[in-house]
Amino acid sequence: MTILKTTILFVLAAVAEIGGAWLIWQAVREGKAWWWAGLGVVALGIYGFFAAFQPDAHFGRVLAAYGGVFIAGSLGWGMLMDGFRPDRWDVIGAAICIVGVGVIMFAPRPGG
């Protein structure tokens, strides 16, 4: 259950953070209405709550592991929303990061 909860929260956090940053990007760089940026700020705030709901009690561990999710998620978002096509090095790098997420979050530790 912990792996499932952690995974779901990381996915929700990625959608909120990457989506929020993308909305701000659209307003600032692509000429969309400024209310897009406002929605982006709200989404970024929501991201913080998803991170705080992680079952692991250590902020540094959660945010370090989330960094790997952010990297892979950003490439995926770019593919879906902007037509970005990652090259093999992008994919290899993202895969390495996801392995790192697993090690950081789920490696057996003394004391449980």
Swiss-Prot record:
Membrane topology designation: Multi-pass membrane protein
Stored Pfam families: UPF0060
Keywords: Cell membrane, Membrane, Transmembrane, Transmembrane helix
Stored InterPro entries: UPF0060
Major subcellular site: membrane
Subcellular location: Cell membrane
HAMAP family documented for this protein: UPF0060 (MF_00010)
Similarity remark: Belongs to the UPF0060 family.
Name this protein carries in UniProt: UPF0060 membrane protein AAur_4166
Organism: Paenarthrobacter aurescens (strain TC1)
